[in-house]
Structure formats: structure tokens, C-alpha cells
Amino acid sequence: DLSIDTITELLHCLDDALLIENGGFEQVKEKMLKEYLGSAYRTPYQAGGVYPSDPSELRGLLSEYCKAIRQEECRVNVNGDLVGILSPHIDYARGQSTYARLWKTARDNLREVELVIVLGTDHYGGPGQITSTFQDYASPLGISPTEISVVQTLANEMGSEFLFKEEFHHIKEHSIELALVWLHYSLEISRLPNIPIVPILCGSFSTF
């Protein structure tokens, strides 16, 4: 049998690790959210882990990924304009060929793009929840400015309480970030300026 002292010690350990949703957890969460909202942009959380934080090293890595893809693998028959890209959000080490083939193919079509609406998987999002943010998204290769007017329109239509209820998730969620690194690289290669974005995290679709 577990003693009261053992249970108490276990609870203290869980509390210290912020694994209990109590006052301490909420205080830390509010502090992190305040720091996030007070920053000039959303800091690239995966830099230095999934991909290099040094711009030159990152460019070299993505360039090597692209060189491994033959040009004939990037030919697709598209009737009309580019309207969307299904980009993976797995780590680059395992998804490199898919990322490279996709973004190398899309590169020539980015010149006409005026706005990128990024729908990223929210691995911790609630059922039916979508979450945007006013923060710009940064990577070592640039900053994607968030189109404030579009996000504000969404907030007006859906309610700010709903749209920003889980904004905290933007801090560490990787799905949008991993796609935007490739967008920044592709724009740089094509000598194009960064394109405004509307970053939206999507929670579980299980309720639909």
C-alpha cells in the first residue's frame, strides 16, 4: 500500500512538473502567454532541434534536401493557379524528400501569391477548436507578417474568446512553423519578399 507521505511526495512532483491543472499551473501558463504576446514575433521553437538555428547552416541543409530531388520529379500538370499546398509537419530528417519535392515544385508559383492561410494541426487542440493569433511567425530565414485585418475579421465573426481560447498552443506547436521555414526558404531562393499569413491551428475533427 502507498503511504500518505508517498502520495503527497508524488503530488508535489507532479505539481512541480506542471502536470496538475491548479493555481500554480495557471500562473506559469499566464506568464508564458504574456511573454509570447509581448514579443515582437512568435519565436521559432523548433530551431536548434528539428532544424539548425543558424541561417547559413539551415540554408545549406534545405539546399542539400532539394539537390537530392531530380527536377523531373517536380513536374506536375496543373490547370489554373496554385491555390493550396499540403505540406507535412513531420521532422525534416524523416520527411526531407517530401518537403523538398513539394516546395521545389511549388517554388515557381509563389510569385502570384498575396496571402497564405496556414491551417496547422493542433496536437493539443480541443474538439472543433480553431485558434489564430495576431503574432507574426519567425524562422531563422525571415518573418511572416500576420495579416491582422483577416484575423480581426475572424475574431469579429467567431468571437475573440473562441478564436484565442487556446492561443497558448501557438508557442510550442510545430505544425505551422515547419511549413513556414520552407516557405521562407522558397521565397528567398526566388528572391521574393515574405508573404502575409493567417496562422490557424486546428483542433480535433472527431466531433464532425
Give the role of each language-model region.
Residues 1-47:
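Long, charge-rich, low-complexity alpha-helical segments
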Residues 40-208:
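Active-site histidine-anchored catalytic micro-motif
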